[in-house]
Amino acid sequence: MSQKLPPLKIYTSQLPLVSHKNMLENEEEASHSQLFTPCPVPPSFPKASKPNSNQPYPNGPVCIYPPNIYLYAKPTMPIIQSFDVVINVAKEVLHPFRTDGRHYRDSKHNLDIQVFDHIEYVHIHWDHDTQFALELDKLVSFVAYNAMQLNKKVLINCQMGISRSACLMIAFIMKTLNLNVSDAYEYVKERSPWIGPNMSLIFQLSEYQQIIRKNSSQGPYQSSSLKQSKRKSEGNLLFPEKPHSAQLPLVSPSTSESSMFTNLRRTRSSGSISNDAS
């Protein structure tokens, strides 16, 4: 009645080798993925791709000088529309508007301005070999005038936000906070770790440092825009409570940065900058 079945042959060479350790690791990964899911991106902004070494600024513009001076790579139209003033220092990057807007000459700063609705757009045709040291002062003054006196939100950009726009931002910090090239570089690098101007651009910043020192032989160097801002109301104009435009939701200054700049205000009024602030 009963029939013997042939013995079952198992060829272990055909089975995947799974150790007890690997099984535990797989279980951990599965449970981790269930517990920790990425936060959804707000619907008003496009989803950013995964950050990698080739993509700086994965979360949008970074505020370098609170509350209203930002650094970024080539901006999209929605990002541009979040600002009042855009300074593009990349020769190869064109504006995304469908028309050329309205043009006027800013005789105060010797710059050509394009106006699109409420946005003032300045295109500076720098490439990586441009000798721009002599141009920096008028651009720094323009940034200071718009951000500090007119309380406008300012974006400085180039193609990647790494070299040319970083140089203009470093130059602004040099003159505004009375820092040398090295300290100003570290100041910007701390807030935007992607920056990395080449040595040719760093040498031009060193040249600009000499220009600043030469022009400041009579006292601390600051642009006329900064001096006028201080004379009016240093606290309200340099660090206004209400920006000219709505805050950019992508990146907002942290509470720690706000408190740090409160200390900077106090140290500037006393004529010195502490090591912690730089």
From Swiss-Prot:
Ranges of Polar residues composition bias in the record: 252-278
GO terms under biological process: negative regulation of cell integrity MAPK cascade; negative regulation of MAPK cascade; signal transduction
GO cellular component, one term: cytoplasm
Enzyme Commission number(s): 3.1.3.48
Record-level Gene Ontology MF annotations: MAP kinase tyrosine phosphatase activity; MAP kinase tyrosine/serine/threonine phosphatase activity; protein tyrosine/threonine phosphatase activity
Residue numbers annotated as active site: 158 (phosphocysteine intermediate)
Cell cycle keyword on record: yes
CDD domains according to UniProt: DSP_fungal_SDP1-like (cd14521)
InterPro entries: Dual-sp_phosphatase_cat-dom (IPR000340), Prot-tyrosine_phosphatase-like (IPR029021), Tyr_Pase_dom (IPR000387), TYR_PHOSPHATASE_DUAL_dom (IPR020422)
SUPFAM superfamilies: (Phosphotyrosine protein) phosphatases II (SSF52799)
Catalytic activity reported: O-phospho-L-tyrosyl-[protein] + H2O = L-tyrosyl-[protein] + phosphate
Region (Disordered): 217-278
Pfam families: DSPc
Ranges of residues in domain Tyrosine-protein phosphatase: 60-214
Keywords: Cell cycle, Hydrolase, Protein phosphatase
Function: Dual specificity phosphatase that dephosphorylates MAP kinase pmk1 on a Tyr. Has a role in chloride ion homeostasis by inactivating this pmk1 MAP kinase pathway.
Family: Belongs to the protein-tyrosine phosphatase family. Non-receptor class dual specificity subfamily.
Protein name per UniProt: Tyrosine-protein phosphatase pmp1
Species whose genome carries this gene: Schizosaccharomyces pombe (strain 972 / ATCC 24843)
Designated gene of the protein: pmp1
